[in-house]
């Protein structure tokens, strides 16, 4: 590999930092109901599985922007990032309060987020949030 090719590839640490920043941006966009940011960060084939149901990208963004799903707060702890080529897995322990169609959901969750690099751009492709004691 030439020096020019090496310079073009971000280091593992740079990639992990980028994904942490994207994760922060995604959480902020949820709280703000920022449709444009959610659409930019989430892949077309995104899927979210959480305690009440599962949603694809279109339904999830619609729920957030319509107010059917209100994210009052999410605090991430123990955020870990592992990069495997063009796939990355982020894990965290979240303290969160959501209101879904009038039903308040508050607690601690173990969250797994999967990112994929497509056409030199990282996107969020899947999230699973599981309640923990």
Predicted regions and their residues:
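A beta-strand edge to alpha-helix "cap/lid" segment located at domain peripheries
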Residues: 2-133
């Amino acid at each position: 590999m030439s020096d020019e090719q090496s310079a073009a590839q971000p280091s593992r640490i740079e990639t992990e930092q980028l994904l942490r920043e994207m994760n922060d941006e995604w959480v902020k966009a949820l709280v703000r109901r920022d449709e444009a940011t959610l659409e930019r960060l989430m892949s077309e084939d995104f899927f979210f599985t959480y305690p009440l149901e599962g949603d694809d990208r279109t339904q999830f963004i619609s729920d957030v922007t319509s107010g059917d799903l209100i994210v009052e707060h999410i605090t991430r702890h123990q955020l870990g990032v592992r990069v495997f080529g063009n796939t990355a897995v982020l894990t965290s322990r979240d303290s969160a309060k959501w209101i879904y169609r009038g039903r308040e959901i508050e607690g601690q969750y173990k969250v797994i987020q999967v990112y994929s690099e497509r056409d030199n751009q990282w996107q969020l492709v899947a999230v699973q949030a599981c309640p923990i004691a």
